[in-house]
Structures are given as C-alpha cells and as structure tokens.
Amino acid sequence: MPSFRDDHIIVIQTGSLYHRATFGLAESLEPPTIRVRTRVGKNDNGEYVFTNKEDINMEDPNVKTDETKVETSESTSEQPSNSNVTEEKNMGSSFHSECKVDDFTPLPNEIQPIQRGRVVDWEALKAFWKHLYSLLLKDPNDTTFRYPVCLVIPTYWSLYDRELATQFFFEECQVPGFTIAYEPLMGLYAIGILHGLVIDIGYEKTDITPILDGQIIFTATQQLPLGGRYMTQHLQNLLRESLPTLKSSGQYVSKEDITELFAEQVKCSEIAQVVRDEQDTAKDPVKALTSTNNVEEEDPAEDIGKIIASGQTRAYLAQKEREKNGESEKDEKPDNTDVEFQTIAIEPLGDCIVGRERFKICEPIFHRPSNETVSLPEAIYITIKNYAANYKRRNDLWENIIVLGCGSRIRGFRECLIQQLQFKYQLSGSLEPYYAAQGTDSILGMTTMPPTPYPALINPCKILPDYFPSWKPDAGTNAMFEELAFLGGSIVAKTSFNESVSSHYVTLEEYAQHGPTAIHTKQ
C-alpha cells in the first residue's frame, strides 16, 4: 500500500465553537492554518449559508498577529511617585481583545450543529464540513489528487456518529484514506507521554479524561457543564453590577450594552487574569519560589526542582537576566494585578474602563457554583479517587495534569488550578496527613476504609519537546498551548498515513468492502 505525501494530508479538529484544520503537513508540524466558527445558517430558500471568507481566521501560521499590544504612551517623562497619577497613566494605554467579533455576528436562522461536544444536527454538520473542505482545497472539484483526512473528535462520540463521519468523507469528499483520533489522547501524544489526566476546557463544557499506558479509561471520564461560555456569562453579570465607564464621555455603559459579546471581548484580552489566592504560600511552588528569591542572601542554594515545578522557568530566567544586567524594576510597567482599572477597546462602543471584575472570571470554575454540580478541583479529585485507577497508579495522573481547550486561555488559569489542587489535596503540611492517617476524607467529610491516599505531588505537565519549534511561546506564530490536541492529531496523521500497511486508517478499498463500520477496526 503506497504511503501518502505529507503535503497532501488534511487534519481537522472538531469543536462546539471552532473547527481547526490544516492542509498539508510540514516537516516540523505547525499550528492550524484555518479556524472556522462551527455554525451554519439557512436562507429563505432553505439553503445553507456560511460565514464569509473574509471573516475566517486564515492568517499565515508563521506570522503572529499582535492584537494585545499596548499602545505606546505619549509621555516618556520620569514616572511620578504619586500612585493615582501612575494609575491614570496606565489607564491611558488601551488594550485590544483577541475576540473575533465578526464570528459572533448571527447568521440567518443560525444552527450550531455541535453543542457541548456532541453532534445535534448531522445534516447541518455535513454541510459545514463540505464548506470547510472547500476552503482547505484550492479546487475541490479537481479529481487529479485525493487527500486523506484525520478527524480529531471527543471520546464520547457514539459508534453511529463515527460511522456517519466515515461515510461522509468517503462518499462526499472521495478521500482515499480516513482515520479518527481522540482529543485527550492527542494531547498526550503532543507532549510525548503515555499517562496523565487531560482537562479540556471547552466552550460549553469541561471534559476530564484519565489516560494510563496510552489507553483512555472511558468509564472514568467526566463532563462538567462548565466552560468558557459559563465564565463569560458570569463576567457579564459582574459587569452589570459594577458598570464599566466609557473613556470618551466618562459615563457608565448601560446594562443593555453589556452583552455577552461585550464580556467575551473583555475575557479574550490581556486585562483578564486569574488572581490566585494568597492562602498557604508554602504549598504553592510559585509563591514559594518568590519567597525563596526574597531571602536569597540567606540561602544561596537555589532549588532547581522547585523552579521547574512552578512552571515559571522562563520568567525566572528573564528576571535573573535583568538582575544580572542591573536593570531596575522601577522602569518596568506595573503588573496588571496592581492596577485597579484598565482600558480596553470594545466594539462598537470604543474604549471602556473596566475594574477588578476582570479578575473574577473563573470563580464559578474553581468554587462550587451550585448544589447541582461540583467545582473543577472537586471533579478532578473524585475522578482520580473513585474511578480512574487503583491507588498504585493514581500518582501517574496527579503528576501529569494537562490543561487544554481555549476556555482555559485566560492568563493564570493553569497556575490557579494547580494551586487549588495542591492546597486542597496535596499531602503536605499538618492537616492532610491527619486525615490520611485517620482514614477520613477531608473534602467529603466521611470516614473511608481503607484510608484515602492523598498525592504527595501534584504537577502540571506542560513541557513541549524541542522538535516542535513552531509551537513554542516565543516562536512568533499563532500557536496556542490550548490547541495541543491538534498537534497530536497531526503527529498521528503523519505517522499513520505514511505506513506501508493501512493498520491505523481505512482505505477506499476497505470502505467499499466493509462500509462505515470499518472505522471501528482501526482504533
């Protein structure tokens, strides 16, 4: 069986809010070249209509659009000592949102074919896929070449859903090869490990998936009805309680103008940030690292392991470089958390001044929003403790926590989540050993037998291999760490479609012989 050329391979990742896709894989795998809002509309004639081509994010993946750059201040004079004057000066710099406003402009009779990760309208989704396929190819009607497709999907798509997807791409797109990959497993493949706990923060849901030895534990997967949109709606309510101010007129923004799109633009900007609690500093590796720096003269030996575990290695090295060069911190801009108000450009209102509500976006995620559901840290604990594995393998999950999904793209989200887990569940200090010794669950408040084992170490797994330079934070591309599942799908597509035998994908001959059910034999 001849292999396919890398520049002929198509990778598509499904999503409730956006589809991500690329046509052709480079030698060094790159971020998706196209991101399309997952929606279709219907005109008066009953025909499907789609987003205009100009509204689709089709920038060159090797060029990063700096949409969150702060405007240069007109004044270059020495910074005044008065804190109020400093704050006014910082407010004069307007931030910009990464939110694509055109993507939220409603279509006529708009349909969202995928909701909470599940397909709710197959006819609309097929029409959308056909539109997406035509965007990827310059001439979809050209029969000279046919291109294999790797489709990255959630773990909970049913067998029937996978069969319908297989049938569509073979019969409608005439692909010569087709395979399906699971999103959480692709996140592990991208990093290069075989076990871990994958947390995917989506648009309307959060998926928690434990993986051991490269195998998904399907019986232990959980889904919470909390996602990026839930955080946006929470921010919208906060802004309506404490109204932002229009910079041009000095008047409050009316409640009617504080729409979900208004809150989405604030959330998708640099002024939005998760501020971690200042509780139990000793258990927080980042804060412990900071406190260690303050007493560096007393203890010159630096804890390298603590620096790496904090996830702030780059920032730490940059700080050391500045100290080495004798640069003063007084010349640096104040931290976002130290500024009471920030100015952001909101379409179509203009510059608006937003207060500290921008720090409370993730409150319903980290703290139980209601009695009907649990918080994200509680769900993670319950997943590992009750379902995922026996106590001998639980540390493999606690020590490899991966946070994916663009719902987690708010600055400080990962660090805050790890801090919450460490504060509540990590076996350190005086409280947790007592509960562990007594056989009492400190969270659920009940006696357990045998004693509940608490992890001795909770770590995020966020180190990318060096052979993916386009995905590095300083690579100057539009890569997002939250899209690592797409990178893993590209890895699987590159290796699967280059095999001499079709052991991991369905060929056109196999489809003609066995039909759509052939996809179940390739996973």
Swiss-Prot record:
Compositional bias per record (Polar residues), positions renumbered to this chain: 79-92
Keywords: Chromatin regulator, Cytoplasm, Nucleus, Transcription, Transcription regulation
Gene Ontology BP term (one): chromatin remodeling
Pfam families found in the cross-reference section: Actin
GO CC annotation: actin cytoskeleton; chromatin; cytosol; nucleus; RSC-type complex; SWI/SNF complex
Segments of this protein annotated with the region Disordered: 56-92, 319-339
Bias (Basic and acidic residues): 56-72, 319-336
Gene3D superfamilies: 3.30.420.40
Record carries keyword 4Fe-4S: no
PANTHER family: ACTIN
Oligomer status and interactors: Component of the RSC complex composed of at least arp9, arp42, rsc1, rsc4, rsc7, rsc9, rsc58, sfh1, snf21, ssr1, ssr2, ssr3 and ssr4. The complex interacts with histone and histone variant components of centromeric chromatin. Component of the SWI/SNF global transcription activator complex composed of at least arp9, arp42, snf5, snf22, snf30, sbf59, sol1, ssr1, ssr2, ssr3, ssr4 and tfg3.
Family: Belongs to the actin family.
General function of this protein: Component of the chromatin structure remodeling complex (RSC), which is involved in transcription regulation and nucleosome positioning. Controls particularly membrane and organelle development genes. Part of the SWI/SNF complex, an ATP-dependent chromatin remodeling complex, required for the positive and negative regulation of gene expression of a large number of genes. It changes chromatin structure by altering DNA-histone contacts within a nucleosome, leading eventually to a change in nucleosome position, thus facilitating or repressing binding of gene-specific transcription factors.
Protein name: SWI/SNF and RSC complexes subunit arp9
